[in-house]
Amino acid sequence: MNLKPLNDRVLVKRLESEEKTAGGLYIPDTAKEKPSRGEVVAAGPGKTADDGKLVAMTVKAGDMVLFNKYAGTEIKIDGVEHLVMREDDILAIIE
């Protein structure tokens, strides 16, 4: 499936959550929190400002980002979990 976000929407693929703690303990699936970082798969063209001009997106495909853990709408593409969210829900780009 090919998905192209509109306006200021971003398609993000979540990164896998940690399998074990820093101390070496394995975390069961039921106790894992969903990660709040991921990779931008696709981004829309941007949003239209009040004056009618297009405000370009800051993020682009391939960027690693940090986002609010309740951000976006979960969807599955070819069995892989993704999120569609607004660019405003992205807190930072990880460099």
From Swiss-Prot:
One GO biological process term: chaperone cofactor-dependent protein refolding
Alphabetical keyword list: Chaperone, Cytoplasm
Subcellular location: Cytoplasm
UniProt GO cellular component terms: cytoplasm
Cell division listed as a keyword: no
CDD domains: cpn10
Main subcellular localisation: cytoplasm
Keyword Cytoplasm (UniProt): yes
SUPFAM superfamilies assigned: GroES-like
An example molecular function term from Gene Ontology annotations: protein folding chaperone
Function: Together with the chaperonin GroEL, plays an essential role in assisting protein folding. The GroEL-GroES system forms a nano-cage that allows encapsulation of the non-native substrate proteins and provides a physical environment optimized to promote and accelerate protein folding. GroES binds to the apical surface of the GroEL ring, thereby capping the opening of the GroEL channel.
Family note: Belongs to the GroES chaperonin family.
Assembly mode: Heptamer of 7 subunits arranged in a ring. Interacts with the chaperonin GroEL.
Name of the protein this chain belongs to: Co-chaperonin GroES
